[in-house]
Amino acid sequence: MRLVFFFVFISGLVLGQEKAPFKQFDEVNKEQYALEKKAIDRSKNTALEKTNLRLRLASRYKFQDDLIIALEDKIKQQGESAQLLYLLGGANGIKALQVNKMFSITYVKAMLENFKRALILDPNYLPALEAYVEALCMVPSLLGGDIDRAKQFAAQLMQLDPVQGFFALGYIASIEEQDEQAVGFYAKAFKLLEQQSFCTQDLKNYFAKSSMNLPYKMAEISTALQLSPAIGLCAINHFIDRYTPYDIIPLEWAYFQKAQLLHAIGKINAATDTIKESLEINPAFEAAKKWQRTL
């Protein structure tokens, strides 16, 4: 079963670059969502089948409250797994970003607890390691954040996947405002990708055990730091090719990254066409319009 929800805890800025927002529930679709949900509830499917359908529906419409409930129901029906706990942690993390800070504490604590439980069940589960490192860095210590623990999990990630390990260390360094050190870690990650002949690999298999947002992250860092733009381009092309309504990063942001990477390798006409694609998806995309004016 393909994951219906993909998570990476994203901060507002990394080394000065604006980050893509998560897609959110559109109130315009509220009535249609309610109709589809009612149809599932009235269907003759088994309880588990209904839960899976509710998961897909809530994920597609980005209705976080129902997504959390459906994931909790699935865990009750199937038992805990690292994958389900990771997804539940991610759903709570995004909900925490959507509500008033006063009401976010419950969701933040649930996020950390579920990532922790996921790694107790499977210490080598890469998506949970990636997400937990970033969450521990972003959450205040009073609520359970702990950069020292994040560094320990980053070291564990390094043993399992050195590329992701260097990305994690780079992220931690950027949070600690050690920008030069962060760039050094990211550069090591891209050097490894070059040594792996990344662009010639079967990327579906390459990312099979990683979060679906990892290729976007690779492209984003490549763009921001001007590191290995050809690799960043391969990564973002893979992300776009595999994009579905269940993804949480807006598609226009993927095309925005692609346009900048095309420009970086000297393909100006292709970059111009690609930024137009981004703006066709979202004509109100200010960052893309601002960048387009520089061409």
Residue ranges and their predicted role:
Residues 49-56, 87, 94, 131, ...:
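"A position-specific structural signal for the A-helix of alpha-solenoid helical repeats
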Residues 11-13:
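N-terminal signal peptide c-region/cleavage motif recognized by signal peptidases
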Residues 56-73, 80, 86-124, 130-159, ...:
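Short coil/linker segments at helix-helix boundaries
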Residues 134, 138, 204-253:
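Alpha-helical adaptor scaffolds
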Residues 32-42, 65-76, 105-119, 145-157, ...:
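Alpha-helical repeat scaffolds
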Residues 43-44, 78, 122, 159-161, ...:
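A structural motif in tetratricopeptide-repeat
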Residues 15-69, 74-76, 83-86:
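N-terminal leader/linker segments that initiate helical-solenoid repeat arrays
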Residues 47-50, 81, 125, 162-164, ...:
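Residue-level recognition of tetratricopeptide repeat
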